């Protein structure tokens, strides 16, 4: 029985599918006949190994028989068999059951002839409706499609998870490359360290300005909770809403937003306010990443701290008439009597405090730009030293000092070259100039508003230096511009004014606004008299006398009055004009007639020629005269007094 082989005599339930047509029809492959199956099985037999296999089987049978004999000789087995007396009965019943089963199978085979047929018997195909077949195939295709789609979704999810895990490192290196283009990085051991300081630009600030670059997943897994004080990590300032493969960790003292506020106060009233903030625009660069704004804010904090530290150190070292005061994050310096310059460092680690603060009024962008330029220039001087010319000359002196010998500079010029101003002195000088310029603008505007005749126009030069401005003032009369135009130029400096008149006179004034106002009123008075004289010449009137500083009459509160005396072409009419230098530009006009009608010869004066001395001057009610302005009224008056003869 051990050498018997199992032979399948049953036909397969289904035939193999050879092809499926486009309409869903399945073409089955016919089963092989008995001879084909026998030939196929015969090809699988290796007759070269049959003898060796038989020998191996015989050897294995002998070994089994020997083992059985040894087991039968074992006393333990004998003892156990004695313990089971029904063992022989069980074996006999089992053999009888096997024989009965075999007999039953033989009878069934003999009774049913189909079991003896090796070739399949063709049966009549059952009638199947086409619609049922189509519906069944569609249902089978739909179930197969659902299985395929679910498999595709699972594969897609797996691939996306694997892609994210693989792309994290790729995105990290790409963003690290972008970070390296804009910021200085170096690798120390297993960490990446960046530099925010301005040391390469010439800064000598002691703060290291370092930041650490880490992967996003590393930081998310080990990030500490936010502190109750409101100061979060640097990466959480601008990066929580933007996915990024890397995170930057800046020091605690560089977190948040910082700016420097400069205020000019007079009696607790803000005259000028400016803020220093390097963030010109808070929009992120698309190629940069979520870390760009964080680093810009941190560098802005470092910049403001360096600037304030430099100003505070200079404020302590400078010896001013009124000492500068440094208290905490505030520096107080005196610009002018009663006017203070307050420089404050404002540093906020809360992102909401900056947004909730009210906008600063009267923002001075010029002072803000100047503070930037001063620190940039300070950095530039630390790294850029003038090269000697010729090359064999000493290293260090500037080109101007090298030309001192050939140019024969005196001691005063050499001392001027050695002087240099600190950042605080330059800021104070610029603040003084801004305050003086605002005062000058206010005086010019108020005088132009109060004085209607003549017209005053101011032209400020657009190309100015931080400590000096230039304004040109034109005084003209409406309708008589070609007759006379009085011009004067004023140079506005830090604490003084320099006025250059049309005739070349130069006058120096202090920062007090009243001095400039008095000067303009005097120029208006002289303009009225000079323009009247030019008008009289055009109308053939004679100028008998003229004075820009009349020394007779009552004492004027401001300067001296200007006056002139005019005579008609026939000398029969006289006009005396007096212009006072007050806020209203008071004008008085007197007329006289020659010869005098009330002249009577007497015992003392008997000659008729004395009648040409003129009579008494009578004042004209100038405000009641017709005319647009002073010169128009004087033109009408001279025209009416001119004799027809």
Curated annotation (Swiss-Prot):
Record carries keyword Transcription regulation: yes
The keyword Transcription belongs to this UniProt entry's keyword annotation: yes
GO MF annotations, alphabetized: transcription coregulator activity
Keywords: Activator, Nucleus, Transcription, Transcription regulation
An example Gene Ontology biological process: regulation of transcription by RNA polymerase II
InterPro entries the record matches: Mediator_Med17
Top-level taxon of the source organism: Eukaryota
Region called Disordered, residue ranges: 215-234
Intracellular or extracellular location(s): Nucleus
Pfam families: Med17
Ranges annotated as biased composition (Low complexity): 222-234
GO cellular component, as recorded: core mediator complex; mediator complex
Quaternary structure annotation from Swiss-Prot or TrEMBL: Component of the Mediator complex.
Function, in words: Component of the Mediator complex, a coactivator involved in the regulated transcription of nearly all RNA polymerase II-dependent genes. Mediator functions as a bridge to convey information from gene-specific regulatory proteins to the basal RNA polymerase II transcription machinery. Mediator is recruited to promoters by direct interactions with regulatory proteins and serves as a scaffold for the assembly of a functional preinitiation complex with RNA polymerase II and the general transcription factors.
Similarity section: Belongs to the Mediator complex subunit 17 family.
Name of the featured protein: Mediator of RNA polymerase II transcription subunit 17
Organism: Anopheles gambiae
Phylogenetic classification of the source organism: Eukaryota, Metazoa, Ecdysozoa, Arthropoda, Hexapoda
Gene: MED17
